[in-house]
């Protein structure tokens, strides 16, 4: 019997929420899982969207986004951070090898 504990890389996505599952944190979490990573998220916007298009965006207050990020990092941590399309400028201004940004 194998009793070796499996460890996973931890990845945090900071992005909007897409209810259709094709973009945003939903797509990121599926990708992390497919790559063998434990995925966590901080939601920056709730989006009214489907496969046809976006009909509305409701931004999450900055202080709440910061709170989500702190909660994840204080408890679970992150080996890498992926920043969604609308937040790419933040990543570009703070170049690190463990931060990835969606250029869209």
Whereabouts are the PLM-identified features?
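Glycine-rich phosphate/dinucleotide-binding loop and adjoining beta-alpha-beta core of small-molecule
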Residues: 56-104
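Glycine-rich phosphate/adenosyl-contacting loop at the front of the ribokinase-like
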Residues: 1-55
